[in-house]
Amino acid sequence: MPITLDPEKLAIVLQHRFNYKICRNCGARNPPDAEKCRRCRSRNLRPKKFKKK
């Protein structure tokens, strides 16, 4: 069952799957409001890449 038909479910899924930050040094997943990496304490964070079809 595709979730692209229901915009509310799609918004929930997109927030759950793409709303976090990735450390550029070690690749760890961090919360979206993180200032430093939880694993290596680096400040070199980026948002999760999102490619919409």
From Swiss-Prot:
InterPro entries in UniProt: Ribosomal_eL40_arc, Ribosomal_eL40_dom, Ribosomal_eL40_sf, Ribosomal_zn-bd
One MF term in the entry's GO annotations: structural constituent of ribosome
Pfam families in the record: Ribosomal_L40e
Coiled-coil residue windows: none
CC annotations in GO: ribonucleoprotein complex; ribosome
UniProt keywords, alphabetically: Ribonucleoprotein, Ribosomal protein
An individual GO BP term: translation
Family, per entry: Belongs to the eukaryotic ribosomal protein eL40 family.
Protein name in UniProt: Large ribosomal subunit protein eL40
Organism: Pyrobaculum calidifontis (strain DSM 21063 / JCM 11548 / VA1)
Gene: rpl40e
